[in-house]
A protein has these predicted regions:
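Conserved catalytic core of the tyrosine transesterase superfamily
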Residues: 1-185
Length: 185
């Protein structure tokens, strides 16, 4: 199995920096690794470093070195984003990642190249410095109608009916988020 422990040194240093210095969670750092692995797998295919018909998920990035990282251009990153929007399967099994997923991968690349230029001082040029993030549509919150609210309150029963009814009333009348409601004592 390809884990971040198998990452090339240049990526491993970046991941360690984020986990130890920046204090990011292990899960966040694992996601950074997966984003970088996807990116460098794509770069290896695009540069002809592996056969075009190679199974994407089996391409190793252990041989990625500073020279390959330095050679990445803004055009390479645009091509990668195009690949993500047209070729990669998404969570629903369809083709093409959402703008939000692509934006997260861009954030990883920005962080990686910023680390290499500003912190590690291994690069002089940051190819993602001028990269824009894809526009993400924000969905508006969906509110319950008056009838739906009444039906919800009417459905409360059980041993803790009074408590649950009060919690729901507070939730509905104050417009609390679930996380805010859970934090109440």
């Amino acid at each position: 199995m390809d884990t971040r422990e198998n990452a090339p040194e240049i990526i491993r240093e970046f991941l360690i920096y984020h986990e130890t210095i920046k204090g990011h969670s292990e899960k966040t750092v694992d996601e950074y690794y997966l984003d970088l692995r996807t990116f460098f797998r794509y770069i290896k295919i695009a540069r002809g470093l592996v056969p075009r018909d190679a199974e994407f998920e089996t391409i190793t990035i252990q041989d990625v070195d500073l020279e390959l990282v330095k050679s990445v251009t803004l055009t390479d990153i645009y091509d990668f984003l195009n690949f993500l929007s047209r070729s990669r399967p998404n969570a629903q099994g369809h083709t093409g990642l959402s703008a939000a997923s692509r934006a997260r991968k861009i954030a990883t690349l920005r962080s990686f190249y910023k680390y290499l230029t500003a912190k590690a001082k291994k690069l002089e040029v940051n190819p993602v410095a001028d990269l824009d993030s894809p526009k993400i549509r924000k969905s508006l919150p969906r509110y319950l109608s008056l009838d739906e609210s009444r039906a919800l309150l009417a459905s409360v029963d059980g041993r803790h009916r009074t408590r649950d009814y009060c919690i729901l009333t507070l939730f509905l009348n104050c417009g609390l988020r679930i996380s805010e409601l859970v934090d109440l004592n």
